[in-house]
């Protein structure tokens, strides 16, 4: 059973917490994790890319020269794809890149990501992760106290406005809540900073 240290907001260690092995102690399935990350990134795409076909480019309605007798190749429009400033043949058009994974796959990917973080020792549990006021300087001090360098993901059980706003302008720091956690955010962070209550919530859902 994995065990992690528990800290308070001053960075002082207050104890230890045993993590549920069914959630934080499985053998990570990296194939499923890859599928989940690929799915997340695909679903983030706007899909608004667009090019003009020969029918949509302005001009080119008249045949540039007669069909025969000039010695040049026959042409029907100066907006054909082979012309400079012509339309694009088979170019991208607006589309949705969204697709879904099965519940079983998404669940296994989440457990694999959490277990990988636990195995790497990158989970930092905070007892009472909250801010008394909106103060970026104080939140930076908190991160320094727990030695959270690099990219950090801060997870709370519910939206805590003071935490969200205090961390908003800190480069590399993202905030989220336990119910909207996703595999990409977990793996993209160097440190997984989570409220003790949020850990319990995750274990309740996934155990």
What do the PLM-derived regions correspond to, one by one?
Residues 31-68:
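A short, flexible low-complexity segment enriched in Lys/Arg and Gly/Pro that occurs
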Residues 1-46, 91-207:
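Extended polybasic, low-complexity segments that bind anionic RNA or targeting/receptor surfaces
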Residues 54-90:
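Glycine/serine-rich anion-binding loops at beta->alpha junctions
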């Amino acid at each position: 059973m994995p065990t992690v240290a528990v800290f308070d907001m001053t960075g002082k260690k207050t104890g230890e917490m045993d993590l549920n092995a069914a959630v934080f102690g499985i053998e990570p399935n990296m194939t499923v994790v890859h599928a989940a990350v690929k799915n997340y990134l695909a679903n983030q795409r706007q899909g608004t890319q667009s090019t003009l076909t020969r029918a949509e480019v302005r001009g080119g309605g008249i045949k540039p020269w007669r069909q025969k007798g000039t010695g040049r190749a026959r042409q029907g429009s100066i907006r054909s794809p082979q012309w400079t400033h012509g339309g694009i043949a088979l170019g991208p058009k607006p589309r949705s890149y969204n697709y879904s994974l099965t519940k079983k796959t998404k669940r296994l990917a989440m457990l694999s990501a959490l277990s990988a973080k636990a195995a790497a020792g990158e989970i930092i549990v905070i007892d009472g992760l909250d801010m008394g006021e909106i103060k970026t300087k104080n939140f930076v001090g908190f991160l320094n106290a727990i030695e959270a360098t690099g990219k950090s993901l801060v997870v709370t059980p519910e939206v805590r406005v003071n935490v969200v706003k205090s961390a908003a302008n800190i480069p590399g720091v993202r905030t989220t809540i336990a119910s909207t956690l996703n595999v990409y955010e977990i793996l993209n962070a160097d440190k997984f900073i989570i409220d003790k209550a949020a850990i319990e919530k995750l274990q309740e859902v996934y155990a």
